Amino acid sequence: MKHFKNKKILVTGGAGFIGSHLTKRLVSVGAKVSVIVKYNSIIDCPRLLSIWDKINVIEADLRNVDSVYAIKKLKFDYIFHFAAYNHVGDSFTHVSESINSNLFSTINLLDHGPKYKKFIHIGSSEIYGLQKKLPF
């Protein structure tokens, strides 16, 4: 993790469980971290409270192209893309919301978002669906 020192890093979904842990770790090694959050009420987020004054919080909804355009001029060494529809069980009944959150937000970020050197897209085992044998 030492190679992230002084690197400009954007974490989408940084207020979520895994994203917040990565954000804290990046801050601890000296990275310059920006976090995209959907709602201004994230100020009450206990996961980021301990590092709130050490991160740049950007309120943006990646599903909205205009929101993504607003951050287009920013430049990052790395983007860690954690933002996703996090109700896996509900994704089967709320397909449109799941597609908007997972697919279109990623497309918007890649096509219209800030410049970056490396893009790290995060997934989960759910992408494999129900398998008789684990593919890993």
Annotate each predicted stretch with a short phrase:
Residues 1-136:
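N-terminal Rossmann-like NAD(P)+-binding domain of SDR-like oxidoreductases, especially those catalyzing
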